[in-house]
Amino acid sequence: NIIYELRPMSVDDFGFKNAIMNMIDKFNRESNVITYYSSINFDDELSIDSNLIISILRIINELNSNAIKYSNGTEIIVNVTLKDNNVIIEFKDNGKGFDYYNTVYDRNKNSGFGLTMLKERVALLNGNIKYIYDNGSDFFIEIPVW
């Protein structure tokens, strides 16, 4: 598992689209409570750097981990699309939501480390992240691919 987390084999073997689909299938198999819905809308012939792909997979994994731990939701929707040379990730759950700003920026709390790392990872990729509370948590992440 540790080696897989560091470098998922499906990235090299199957490409970006299938790596995302395999990861979401893995989430579905491992959960007895959450139902996953996904939409991956791009051509798998894309030539995207494997390190960028791994970073995107880690972002989705972190969002999933947080949703499982904290949302108390029963559904997660993951949409990944390519638009204007950007990978767009929408990650939505139907859980209780939270105050994103205070969780990420309040250093007096002993929480939000995963989200802080997520924010920093997205920034290092020259991307941006937007959070909306809408009957659960809804993240929109945009990352340039070239």
Q: Where are these predicted regions, by residue range?
A:
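Short beta-strand/loop element within the Bergerat-fold HATPase_c
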Residues: 75-85
